[in-house]
Regions:
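Substrate-binding/gating loop at the entrance of the active-site cleft, primarily
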Residues: 1-10
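Active-site pre-lysine segment of PLP-dependent enzymes
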Residues: 6, 22-34, 46-69, 73-106
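Short beta->alpha connector loops at strand-helix junctions that form conserved
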Residues: 13-19
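Structural motif
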Residues: 37-41, 70, 116-118
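PLP-dependent enzyme catalytic core of the Aspartate aminotransferase-like
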Residues: 54, 201-204, 208-209, 214, ...
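PLP-dependent aminotransferase class I/II
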Residues: 96-180
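Conserved PLP-binding catalytic core of the aspartate aminotransferase-like
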Residues: 162, 166, 173-209, 225, ...
Length: 247
């Protein structure tokens, strides 16, 4: 978000989270007359937390009408919580909410670069006027249509993700690591601050085992690693490696 904001000579304003979750009150306090767009990743990356539909409604109600609220639901398909919504109701209720989604996550088409948006016609008209011609290739469109038809794959990916996320969380917390609740296809793992067992040392150890995770220093979480949920063999290898590291 900061990169695309600066591309149009705008000023990005980061809003602090509360307990690793977006804070509606902090968002509203940060809004000024100059605010044009509010971007919210829901579920959030890299924490895996989310705002409920009621909190989203409270956020939209507290924003000035001139502020466009953009809900990035890249990980929405992984969420099974009853109080979650990607924002369809908010788009339907007004003319200043945009919902964006991607085929890069649960559909496994990250390299295809295909996404979509549900938004007011006026917003779609602006996007159509500024987008590049032929911005979505025929191959990407074909891949997207095939992915939408393969509902069995999506259902299995969702079930496997829930099972292995819970299993991985249980194993890692058993090693004394902190793993905040996640509704996405990854977990945020927080490590001790001592040099021998901190996140940097854990990352290096995992790399020596051929396991790649994501360092979180750039997100303001230098004590953490983000670990994607894969298949059982991959998660077993990860757990075994971290068991060795923590011992």
């Amino acid at each position: 978000f900061p990169i695309v904001t600066r591309l149009v000579d705008a000023t990005p304003v980061k809003v602090a989270e509360k307990n690793l979750c977006a804070d509606v009150d902090a968002f509203l306090a940060a809004v000024t007359d100059k605010t044009k767009i509010l971007f919210l990743a829901n579920p959030n990356n890299p924490t895996g937390s989310f705002l409920s539909l009621n909190e989203l409604k409270r956020l939209r109600a507290g924003l000035p009408d001139h502020v466009l609220m953009v809900l990035d639901g890249a990980y929405a398909e992984f969420v099974t919580a009853d109080d979650y919504s990607p924002g369809v109701e908010l788009v339907d209720a007004g003319d200043n909410v945009v919902m964006t989604r991607t085929f890069s996550k649960i559909y496994g088409l990250g390299g295809v670069r295909l996404g979509w948006s549900y938004c007011p016609p006026e917003v779609a008209d602006v996007l159509n006027r500024i987008r590049n011609p032929f911005n979505v290739s025929a191959i990407a469109q074909a891949a997207g249509l095939a992915a939408l038809e393969d509902t069995a794959f999506v259902a299995k990916a969702l079930t496997d993700n829930e099972t292995l996320r819970a299993w991985t969380t249980e194993k890692l917390t058993g090693f004394g690591l902190s793993v905040p609740p996640s509704v996405a296809n990854f977990v945020l793992v927080r490590f001790p601050l001592d040099e021998a067992q901190n996140a940097e040392a854990a990352d290096a150890f995992l790399k020596s085992k051929g396991i790649i995770v994501r360092r979180m220093g750039g997100y303001g979480l230098p004590d953490s690693l983000r670990i994607s949920i894969g298949v059982q063999d991959e998660m077993t290898a990860l757990v075994d490696a971290l068991s060795e590291f923590m011992s």
